[in-house]
């Protein structure tokens, strides 16, 4: 019944995913109702389901369609009362934010920074963190100072401007959720406290690997780097995510909703300087 729009799909459309062969229907996530099943005992017709990753939209046709044909092993049943637009905002984006939150081992006293705060994952992370850890002090970075008010409304306590990959602050942080990736990694580490954790989750900076990185001299003593890969998914973790959203009354509604006929406009918005939060397409 719907799906999220992701920057990785824009990268693929632009030709940066070398393993993808065209023509190909894009789309790495979806939510909906099973209309036909070859495993009716586990996923009978009428079941509410989620699917993400697993080479959907890459090795085989993805979710930018009215119907999606998926391998049974990547179809996950979920129990949720969310409406379709909100449910469509959850799978890839909130799953990534949820995994990042767990890997950072957040404590109430932490000063937490999100690099790439206005992205879908950045906004989702803010909502999850403030739902479960309301006392943690949350900072968000953005290249566009004009998004400050919207970031504060989304749950950030303070906003820091990012100038070409360098944060305009002398502050250091206990935990950093880095959604920019390798292009900003050195600067992120420079703002990580001793004993702090940085979780690299995204590649919004458009760079896939870190050049000339010496783990001894560049990381710094007592600092920790981890990562989260949203392709590592199972039904239990997805249900735990939906349960958390319900338990803490988290508003997971998307920022923008488009129709199936307007996918081009949806990608254009996500790729624009005005983009904020999660963008979804609903097919009802």
Describe these PLM feature segments:
Residues 1-4, 14-56:
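Glycine-rich beta-strand-centered segment in the early N-terminal region that forms part
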Residues 37, 117, 180:
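NAD(P)H cofactor-binding loop motif with strongest signal on the N-terminal glycine-rich segment
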Residues 51-116:
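NAD(P)H dinucleotide-binding glycine-rich loop of Rossmann-like/cofactor-binding domains
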Residues 87-164:
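Mid-domain Rossmann-like dinucleotide-binding core that forms the NAD(H)/NADP(H) cofactor-binding site
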Residues 99, 233-284:
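C-terminal hydrophobic helical "lid"/dimerization subdomain
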Residues 151, 183-250, 283-284:
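Glycine-rich phosphate-binding loop and adjacent beta-alpha segment
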Residues 168-176:
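A short acidic, Gly/Pro-enriched loop at the edge of an enzyme's catalytic core
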């Amino acid at each position: 019944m719907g799906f999220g729009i992701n920057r990785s799909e824009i990268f693929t459309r632009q030709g940066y995913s070398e393993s993808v062969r065209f023509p190909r229907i894009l789309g790495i996530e979806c939510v909906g109702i099973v209309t036909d099943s070859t495993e009716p005992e586990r996923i009978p017709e009428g079941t509410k389901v989620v699917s993400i990753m697993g080479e959907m939209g890459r090795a085989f046709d993805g979710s930018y369609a009215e119907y999606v044909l998926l391998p049974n092993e990547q179809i996950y049943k979920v129990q949720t009362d969310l409406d379709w637009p909100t449910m469509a905002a959850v799978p890839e984006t909130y799953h990534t934010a949820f995994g990042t939150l767990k890997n950072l081992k957040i404590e109430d006293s932490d000063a937490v920074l999100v690099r790439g705060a206005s992205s879908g994952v950045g906004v989702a992370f803010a909502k999850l963190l403030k739902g479960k850890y309301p006392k943690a002090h949350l900072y968000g970075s953005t290249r566009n100072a004009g998004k400050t008010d919207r970031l504060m409304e989304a749950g950030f306590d303070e906003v820091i401007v990012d100038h070409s990959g360098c944060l305009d602050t002398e502050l250091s942080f206990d935990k950093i959720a880095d959604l920019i990736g390798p292009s900003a990694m050195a600067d992120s580490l420079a703002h990580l406290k001793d004993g702090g954790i940085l979780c690299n989750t995204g590649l919004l900076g458009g760079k896939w690997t870190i050049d000339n990185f010496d783990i001894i001299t560049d990381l710094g003593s007592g600092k920790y780097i981890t990562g989260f890969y949203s392709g590592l998914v199972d039904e239990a973790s997805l249900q735990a995510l939906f349960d958390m959203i319900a338990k803490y009354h988290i508003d997971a509604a998307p920022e923008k909703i488009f129709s199936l006929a307007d996918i081009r406009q949806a990608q254009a918005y996500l790729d624009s300087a005005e983009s904020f939060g999660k963008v979804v397409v609903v097919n009802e």
